[in-house]
Amino acid sequence: MNSLLLWLLLLAPPEGFEAQRQRMVDEHIASRGIRDKAVLGAMRETPRHLFVPEHLRSEAYDDHPLPIGRGQTISQPYIVALMSEMLGPGQNLRVLEIGTGSGYQAAILSKLFKEVYTIEILPALAEQAQAVFRQLKLQNIHTRVGDGYQGWPEQAPYDRVLLTAAPPEIPSALIDQLAPGGRLVGPVGADPLAQYLVVVEKDKAGKTRRRVSYPVRFVPMVPAR
């Protein structure tokens, strides 16, 4: 590198979060096959840096998970986009999310669905996520502290269900709360080294069909004690 180019690089202002976010979508999401325009738009608009601990914000737009405390993580951006696309977004649809965590996935879903119902078992994480939802004025997200294995029966049925933590098997309560014609997407597997994204579709008659897709690695889905 010649001295003039080095000097210009040193003088250049640091890349801001907005530019980092657009680069993340271009280099790590769109380039890897995500095509849904609504999903790409949501990923471009949603400030991931607000959902990570302040000391990790410099890594907010890198394509990898980050710890958010209490043994939990915010998922890799590509996986967030992939699962959102696999769900099949729709502005007239209602979605149940199991595992609010940082709130980032719910924020993405809020731009893709009419209503988002999200359950978090750890009260402190739910409170942190709700604070960011309020900051971003995301008024179509409804948060509940509770056991994700039981779902949210009072608001059922749901057109879509998304799991952001991995149970050994898909809880029957979540299948029951899935509307006819609905779809569930989530990681499944007790062994973190042998988890797969699973898609369950329920037809109009209530029969379900299951298919296994990509290998993944998620934190375990923890039941209430």
Where are these regions (language model features)?
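Sec-dependent signal peptide recognition
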Residues: 1-7
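N-terminal auxiliary segments of SAM/dcSAM-dependent transferases
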Residues: 7-55
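Solvent-exposed, acidic/flexible segments
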Residues: 17-22, 32-36, 72-80, 98, ...
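Conserved alpha-helix/loop element of class I SAM-dependent methyltransferases that forms part
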Residues: 26, 31, 56, 60-93
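Structured segments of extracytoplasmic/periplasmic soluble domains
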Residues: 27-32, 42, 46-49, 86, ...
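Conserved nucleotide-cofactor-binding alpha/beta core module
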Residues: 88-209
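Short, solvent-exposed aromatic-acidic interface loops
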Residues: 212-222
